[in-house]
Amino acid sequence: MSQSNQPDSSVTQTQAEEAVRTLLRWAGEDPTREGLLDTPRRVAEAYGDWFSGYREEPREYLERTFEEVAGYDELIVLRDISYESHCEHHMAPIIGKVHVGYLPRGKVVGISKLARVVESYARRFQVQEKMTAQIAQCIQDVLQPLGVGVVVEGAHECMTTRGIHKRGVSMVTSKMLGTFREDARTRAEFLQFIEVGGKR
């Protein structure tokens, strides 16, 4: 596991909780009142869950592959993988779906592993464009398929609950590698399978 993904071990749980108390006071609240007494602990624990991706190496999920697939060499698509992330600019939630497709080159991976890769990158502070590229590049580097396609849909609460306050807006990003980028037919087949924004 990459050590660069590890949280700063010099920051203690106590320090994290005190930081939450500081923010509560800055917002105008009294962190010692009954309703907020356990809030610092709860927030610190929630952060441990929301940002657990920093303690994982996504590539490890793809290391176990299967080659006995009766020569299957057609498109594999996993769509509607739900995710929750947080934007690195305002620490506000990003909630959406990821669609992943790849054209295998002799080996495939369990579908739950693709979902775990998505979760590992999503459970970090993110920019949607970067997360899209990270997921695609991880699959390409480890599985070395003929091509990879990743499409990410996300509703950004930094836009819906602050600033311009525009609800119902969804951002869509994509990353195409290999034959998905070079062959319009492969790309079109993938996009037809996932039908982003359309009825299924």
UniProtKB/Swiss-Prot annotation:
InterPro entries: GTP-CH-I_C/QueF, GTP-CH-I_N, GTP_CycHdrlase_I, GTP_CycHdrlase_I_CS, GTP_CycHdrlase_I_dom
SUPFAM superfamilies recorded: Tetrahydrobiopterin biosynthesis enzymes-like (SSF55620)
Gene Ontology MF terms: GTP binding; GTP cyclohydrolase I activity; zinc ion binding
Source organism, top-level taxon: Bacteria
Quaternary state and interactors: Toroid-shaped homodecamer, composed of two pentamers of five dimers.
UniProt-listed NCBIfam families: folE, PRK09347.1-2, PRK09347.1-3
Protein name: GTP cyclohydrolase 1
Provenance organism: Xanthomonas euvesicatoria pv. vesicatoria (strain 85-10) (Xanthomonas campestris pv. vesicatoria)
